[in-house]
Amino acid sequence: LEEVQKMIDGGEAEIARDELLWLLNGCSDCLVAHRMLGELALADQDLRLARGHFGYAFEIGSKALDRAGAKGNMPYRLPANQAFFEAGKALAYCLRELGKSVLAAEVVARLLACDPSDPLGVRNMLDVPAPESAPGGPAPVDG
């Protein structure tokens, strides 16, 4: 995947796309490869294709979390988690741009449940209130 990133950085998007598709033939659940293909599609302004790749990457991560019974925080700051969050943010963007704001809000909610600190600013994408100002959210602490 590092070599593919070098190709993209060097302006060889078509070759990079072919390499990623070849990689997915052997490992269709490679979250990072789908995220990268989504980024290439987004660069080509193909929102539907980008949504497909970002959505598949997000689904891979979500299913892994569900199978693991993950509860609590999954911080973005850990490198192993970053592709999931980046794919989710890009998916929410694509969904919003395609007029699917309810689905975009569901993606944002999942990301915020995983890391409430919101390091990628997904809350701002849909004007989702911060937890402390949300109805039923934690009360502010005087101190």
Identify the meaning behind each predicted range.
Residues 1-26, 90, 94-97:
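Alpha-helical segment of the N-proximal tetratricopeptide repeat
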Residues 30-31, 64, 101, 115-119:
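Residue-level recognition of tetratricopeptide repeat
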Residues 13, 47-48, 101:
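TPR-repeat structural position
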Residues 7, 41, 95, 129-130:
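Residue at a conserved register position within TPR or TPR-like alpha-solenoid repeats
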